[in-house]
Amino acid sequence: ISFVSMEGAQKNLEHDIPDWDFNKVSVCTRKMWNDALSKIKIEGNESDKTTFYTALYHTMIDPRCFSDIDGKYIGADNKVYQTSTFTYRTIFSGWDVFRSQFPLQTIINPDLVNDEINSLIQIAEKSGKGYYPRWEFLYAYSGCMVGNPAVSVLTDAYQKGIQNYPVDKSIQYAINTVRTFGNNEDGYDPGDLSKTLEYAYSDWCVGTLLRSQNR
């Protein structure tokens, strides 16, 4: 599979399944998942373990890889780009995951979090919007749910030392995001109370980022 080209799909296939051996692919896949899931070890009966590791597996499905093995990906302006510094990812269901899945990933899979922040920065930049998507799908701004969850993900990662991305640019896009969707000078949203609460939290996140840089 490639979102870029047939040639990209061929390269991905040759990299992922060079031998075209079903049994070998099965063994390798099982090992990869066992390695990923073994980052957390628990004690308990088999039923409890099945429930826990099934849930842990679910946290590792998205955001999924959107770039080819050679680093090429389709940007938010529908042009092809290439990177060697991160894996471009998609399906950021921000409001669903910023309180739970992403704080967990900062502990067990910080590289994934770093990938996602780089991807969000690229979307804000290549789209020309200059702010983060709330719920991203195939580099599109769906606008689903409320608040500014990407700002929270960025703040949590930055405070934990996950910073392998253009920090100044990431913070500027965070500022733009809360200015575009936020309480701003009024200090509240005239709509639902839940919006005021979410926006107040993202304002605090931006303030935390700026204080971390003595700004």
Positions of predicted regions on the chain:
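Glycine-rich, histidine-containing beta strand-loop boundary motifs that form or position
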Residues: 1, 70, 104, 116-117
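Acidic/polar, glycine-enriched structural segments that form the non-catalytic walls/loops
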Residues: 1-88, 122, 129-130, 168
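A generic structural signal for ordered alpha-helices
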Residues: 11, 78-82, 91-94, 98, ...
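Second-shell loop/turn segments in exported
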Residues: 15-22, 37-45, 88-90, 101-106, ...
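Active-site cavity-forming subdomains of large catalytic enzyme subunits
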Residues: 112-120, 124-215
